[in-house]
Amino acid sequence: MSELNKIALKILSNGKGILAADESNGTMTKRLESVNIQSSPENRLLFRETLFEADSMRDCIGGVILYDETINQISNDGKTIPSLISDTGAIPGIKVDTGAKNLANSSEEKVTEGLDGLRERLKRYYQLGARFTKWRGVYNITENYPSKLAINSNAHALARYSALVQEGGMVPIVEPEVLMDGEHSAEDCLIKTSEVIKKCFEELIIHKIDLSGVCLLYTSPSPRD
């Protein structure tokens, strides 16, 4: 069993889940200000510390996805945030993409960016304690979308990301998210989602990814009104 496979299995062991605590500062600001709390680095840290120190963390959470700000912070008792998470038995992870941008020659669709400088960032995240990462591709469903261009572009980016992550000794979470917005049927969503995931794995294989050290995160097909 490879070390990457051991990490992947530990994240999902005993029916545990992954806590997504990788909200951007903008998203955290909206959440905190909605309850009249100032969105300062200290308050964002306190919010996340409250999650990580909950009694149910040890029993329910196998991995925690962090935001760049958070993985660099120190808890109120002097521990690094990754150490605080590791003490619960969970594995620290980090979101590494830099967001979805308009896809050239198909402006209604998105392609996720963040490959530039990723190898260097991954080295730093590993030193900080991260052992898995996340990258999210986004796809719209309409009569004409997702296009082959969007499917291929995002699959290629996910594979290149995965190769760099495994090179750095971490497990990549591959998230090809087919958005639920629209008027599509469950059947249409199933067809599009299957096409997206199939292409992702074709690219992962081309890039010689160790599939036993990959976690797939996807949206279950569903109809929308």
Predicted regions and their residues:
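Alpha/beta catalytic barrel-like cores
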Residues: 1-128, 139-141
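Alpha-helix N-cap and loop-to-helix initiation/capping positions
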Residues: 39, 110-117, 146-157, 184-196
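Conserved, mostly hydrophobic/aromatic
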Residues: 40, 135, 174, 216
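Non-cysteine beta-strand/loop elements that form the S-adenosyl-L-methionine
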Residues: 93-95, 133-138, 214-215
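Glycine-rich, proline-tolerant flexible connector loops at the mouths of alpha/beta enzymes
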Residues: 70-72, 137-148, 181-183
